Amino acid sequence: MRNGDTIIDVGCHPGGWSQVAVEVTGLDGRVIGVDLEPCAPIDGVELVVGDITEKRTQDLIVEMLDGDPIHTIVSDISPSLTGQYERDQAISIDLVCAVMDFSFPILNPGGSFVTKIFQGRGIEGVVEAAKVRFSKVQRYSPEASRNSSSETFLVCVNKLPRARGFGQKETVAEFVERTMVESGIITEGEDEAELAGKVGFRVHRAARDQE
């Protein structure tokens, strides 16, 4: 992040990353924060209350940008934890895929994408999908997170003008789901209700519909 940059902070509640982004980007920068939970007002931050995985929220953000280039997208998005790690981790992968698929088309070439992600099944597919979209991809665990092996950050630097290889034909979500089918983590055509604890794709939506 640099002075004058435009930043999107996904999963911004309670606002810590957004505050840092405002300080770094300065008066010439722009920071948009989005979260399901309302945040207290933050000077210099445009706040959106909504689900980043839903088209109406995505469309609102694109409308707010009005063509402004986006230099960095940071995501601290996390599922509502159930205490069942396999399910929580699967939904985390699902959410990260959704945010990446929204971010890549609107992120400026040369831009950066940073996201929190839970370790486990599907993470290697996410890393591979990132590598065909960015020139440098690394995992990073801050000191505060190193006592827990479950959480890490994926740091993607220098977005390519165009995705390479399979990235031209498949979304991140499609690729990750395909790799998990091919590796036997999930079975193609498996009922959604049976996917809980195996993969987050569609599970959090199905669970929400049942509530």
Identify the residue ranges that each predicted region occupies.
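A generic alpha-to-beta junction signature in SAM-dependent methyltransferases
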Residues: 1, 25, 65, 106-107
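Conserved class I S-adenosyl-L-methionine
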Residues: 2-13
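Glycine-centered, small-residue-biased loops immediately flanking beta-strands
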Residues: 5, 29, 111
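Conserved SAM-binding loop of SAM-dependent methyltransferases across substrates and taxa
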Residues: 14-27
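Class I S-adenosyl-L-methionine-dependent methyltransferase catalytic core
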Residues: 28, 36, 62-63, 166-170
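S-adenosyl-L-methionine
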Residues: 34-82
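Conserved Class I SAM-dependent methyltransferase catalytic core
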Residues: 85, 89-91, 95-140
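SAM/dcSAM-binding transferase cores
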Residues: 147-211
